[in-house]
Amino acid sequence: MSEIQARAAGASVQPPLSQAVGYVIVVVLGLIIAGADKAVMMVITKILKKTTGEDNKKTEMFMTANRTVRTGLTASAVISSWLWTTAMLGASFVGYDYGVAGPFWFAAGCSPMIVFFALIGISYKRKIPDAHTSLEVVRIRYGRIAHAVFMTLCLINNIFACANMLLGAAAVISAITGMHIIAATFLLPVGVTVYTFVGGIKATFLTDYFHTAIILIIACYLSVKAFTFEEVGSIGKLYELVQAAAQRHPVSGNQDGTYLTMTSKGAILFGILHICSNFGLVIMDTSYFIKAFSAAPSSVVPGYTIGGIAYFAIPWALGTIMSSLALGLENTASFPTYPRRMTSTEVSNGLVLPYAAMTIAGKGGAAAVLLITFMAVTSTLSAQVIAVSSILSFDVYREYINRAASDRDIIRASHFGVIFFAAFSAGFSTMLHYVGIDLGWTLYMLGVVTCPGIFPMAFTILWRRQSRAAAILSPILGMATGIGVWLGTAQHFYGAVSVSSTGQILPCVYGTVASAFSPIVYSVLITLVKPQRYDWAEFRKEKLGLERLDSDSDITVNGQGSEEQQNRTSFDPQELKRWGRIAAFWSIATFLGHWVLWPLPMYGSKYVFGKGFFTAWVIVGIIWLWITMLVAIFYPLLDGGMQQMLQISRALRGRREAVTSTSLPSVNNDSPEVFRVNEKS
């Protein structure tokens, strides 16, 4: 029996799958995927090196994919970056707690800042196109003290983000298979470490693509399977089941106690907390900057905009359907916890989704949730791991240990960072588990520690007047303010500072808002004392490029020079400025649409869903979810994927022709089918 079930009050739920299945998925499948990724990446790397000049032994390729990732793959990677286990497990459990408003506010707390990041990303492309991490930019503008402050904030962000993922995923795997939760916590990062170690950021893009495809296919399957289950049968019947659930146990703070309304005090408080927390997770997560740096300049804005809007459907549709199933069916014999309701421990551990899937699809549903949990945590964890490895290699090793570091040195440091952080995150998550902290606690309090650097970091690239002192002090003061408010309100409302009280919604909302917005006040006031006016041209004076290894090859495709060299000269300032205006428009439009114009009138009207409106609500969500699947799977193939495969095929044919003609006295270098490889002597 798993530890999660043992801790739950009432009758325990027997895991539907054996421990052997858990170990096969977590260990064997993880290593198979890692091995397959390694083999595929080795083949792809070798082919791309010969045909397009992409060499994963170069840091520019390992860390930024030569800054040439196109819109389709960028959009897919953005969807994958937010496709955390928390997105599926958390959206379902807030739906169980608050009704239909919960999953909506979960989704609305994600999409606006994903799109907003397009504005940040294009600003970096305009002002410092050769950057590898956001922390490099902080160091150049404000110096080493600020660099150390923001490096600490980013590492805190990554540590808590990984803990949030691992706590939820390990709890679900334990509940489904009976596998020990600590074993799951330590074994999940193993496969991630292997394929990230080998492939760098390109591996995370490609692996994310395949993992996201599998997750979305299963999510779409569950969205349809729900209505083929005999006790549900239709959306209208599901409406009746949820309505009956509200009569059995009405929701405090919801209009008429129903689950079928957007007028939910708890849900809107969660929405405020979630959007602030997620702004912190995005701005302070260097993996988002790495993917923005990796994208071609013309792909940043459309990639992040399409990805952000498409992503909205995943927590909204899946969370609404699965939480409604759990609410409607938990008083039936088919539900795993029958005859009791789910306990608060089970809900907070994210077990709403797996229990609902087990109800409608039996062991197949359990296996499906086990698979998507594994895929989601390994995919998103890989981005976190490479983000931290980039900090340790560029911002620690290259800056403070070996300023003359070569490509080989930095790749070695990156490899060390991958291994170190994977082990550390597993150990930190284990510590949290043993002090009684779970997915729900980390989901609620995350913003307290991730938000203090939001505005000082954004001002670094958007506001030339922020002073060095303001950049250094405002996030520190913001962190202190947020933690003080968080703990103080926990004491005020619940009479004690404990794991239980600090994980409640009100202290976390107050603490998160204080952490997010107090640094604005601190930054402006400190800047007014001694204002500065930074010259953006200073960014370009910093040498961020890396010396090439003596063994590097000069690869020329069609006589045009390396793709990296072409790319570095392809930044058109006017074009980037135009993309900046487009990014600003879509950022505002997405926030207004998803957070203001759609939900707030419904909240204020105190409207309770009728059967017809609920049916339309669910249908729109399902259609949106299926469109997201099509965008994530097929858009990368249509947007350059097939073209690159054809390019590689032509180049390989050209190489074979060049090899067969080596006896000729000369080679026609103008032929589009011929390329040259000139090794340095």
Enumerate the predicted regions with their spans.
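Membrane-embedded helix-loop-helix hairpins and adjacent transmembrane boundary segments
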Residues: 1-681
